[in-house]
């Protein structure tokens, strides 16, 4: 087993991740989805991770060449980044999501944008998605035009592209424009998760409640699978905030999404946030991806622009 990297931060309640061969899945939980069988086996020879990047594209230092329509003002620096080793192909798993089969914890770190800190000019968000050992699993890059970002701010519609170690887009998250006021339950928030891009595998929809933030995780047929329930006050000072992942009857807790406290200075002057996700190891891979989408929706709904 590879030791954690020096400086790797694990939030409270998150145990170190063990090799898949040494871990058995947790007991069954109420409301757990089952595996589907409509995906083909990815081709063998899936390329392994790279220790660093030497190929750059215009405006995207550190990435292999890609044709993604990402805004040119973004700069992503990932030189000398340690990536999670590429797992073997898995039956009935969307290409690029094999990593999630070996993971029961994810850490999401939003990059601090100096331009945004100094000028208040809203830029496209960029996130690092790591496992509990600090190894990079994915990178998430927002793709939104300047006018939309600065006019709609946290309520803006966006496309979030999830890239692997080769710079290939393995997931796409689409959030439509909807009124974010809690007084209008007819305009509840939602996000669509696609893997591969263009193929919906699930949705996250807001469930109206007068006091609590609630989300419903759905499969590709829009059938309800899991619930996410947050605290009455989603913004607290000097402490982590837990959004519990529960069964549909909200009785059994199977995981959580944690907004981690980043310190007074970072919280006060930036909207750069850190999150942790914990879910069962044997949860269906596509529902793990939908849970990741729920984390990003929570960030934009409750914490984006809260500095």
UniProtKB/Swiss-Prot annotation:
Gene: Plscr2
Extracellular-side segments: 304-307
Keyword Membrane set for record: yes
The family this protein is said to belong to: Belongs to the phospholipid scramblase family.
Organism lineage: Eukaryota, Metazoa, Chordata, Craniata, Vertebrata
Lipid-attached positions, S-palmitoyl cysteine: 182-183, 186-187
Protein name: Phospholipid scramblase 2
Membrane topology of this protein: Single-pass type II membrane protein
Spans through the membrane: 287-303
GO CC list: cytoplasm; membrane; nucleus
Catalytic activity: a 1,2-diacyl-sn-glycero-3-phosphocholine(in) = a 1,2-diacyl-sn-glycero-3-phosphocholine(out)
Summary of the function given for this chain in its UniProt record: May catalyze calcium-induced ATP-independent rapid bidirectional and non-specific movement of phospholipids (lipid scrambling or lipid flip-flop) between the inner and outer leaflet of the plasma membrane.
Sequence positions bearing Phosphothreonine: 159
PANTHER family linked to this entry: PHOSPHOLIPID SCRAMBLASE 1, PHOSPHOLIPID SCRAMBLASE-RELATED
Cellular compartments annotated: Membrane
Record remark on domains: The N-terminal proline-rich domain (PRD) is required for phospholipid scramblase activity.
Tissue expression from the record: Expressed in erythrocyte membranes, blood platelets, blood leukocytes, T- and B-lymphocytes, vascular endothelium, spleen, thymus, prostate, testis, uterus, intestine and colon.
InterPro entries: Scramblase
GO BP terms, alphabetized: cellular response to lipopolysaccharide; plasma membrane phospholipid scrambling
Ranges where the record places region Disordered: 1-37
Region feature Proline-rich domain (PRD), mapped onto this chain: 1-82
């Amino acid at each position: 087993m590879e030791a954690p990297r020096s400086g790797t931060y694990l939030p409270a309640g998150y145990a170190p991740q063990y090799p898949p061969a040494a871990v058995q899945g947790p007991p069954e939980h109420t409301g757990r989805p089952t595996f589907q069988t409509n995906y083909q086996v990815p081709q063998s020879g899936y390329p392994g991770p790279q220790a660093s990047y030497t190929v750059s594209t215009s405006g995207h230092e550190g990435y292999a060449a890609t044709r993604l329509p990402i805004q040119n003002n973004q700069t992503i620096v990932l030189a000398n980044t340690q990536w999670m080793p590429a797992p073997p192909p898995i039956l009935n798993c969307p290409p690029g999501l094999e990593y999630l089969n070996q993971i029961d914890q994810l850490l999401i770190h939003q990059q601090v944008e100096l331009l945004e800190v100094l000028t208040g000019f809203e830029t496209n968000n960029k996130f690092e998605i790591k496992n509990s050992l600090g190894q990079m699993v994915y990178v998430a890059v927002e793709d939104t035009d300047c006018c939309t970002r600065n006019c709609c701010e946290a309520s803006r519609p966006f496309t979030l592209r999830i890239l692997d170690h080769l710079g290939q887009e393995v997931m796409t998250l689409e959030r439509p424009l909807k009124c974010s006021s809690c007084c209008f339950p007819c305009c509840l928030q939602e996000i669509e998760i696609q893997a591969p891009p263009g193929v919906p595998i699930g949705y996250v929809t807001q469930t109206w409640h007068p006091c609590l933030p609630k989300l419903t995780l759905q499969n590709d047929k829009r059938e309800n699978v899991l619930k996410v329930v947050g605290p009455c006050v989603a913004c607290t000072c000097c402490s982590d905030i837990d959004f519990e992942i529960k069964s549909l009857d909200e009785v059994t807790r199977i995981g959580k999404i944690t907004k981690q406290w980043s310190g007074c200075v970072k919280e006060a002057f930036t909207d750069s946030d850190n999150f942790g996700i914990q879910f069962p190891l044997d949860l269906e891979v596509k529902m793990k991806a939908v849970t990741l989408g729920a984390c990003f929706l929570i960030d934009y709904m409750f914490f984006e622009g809260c500095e």
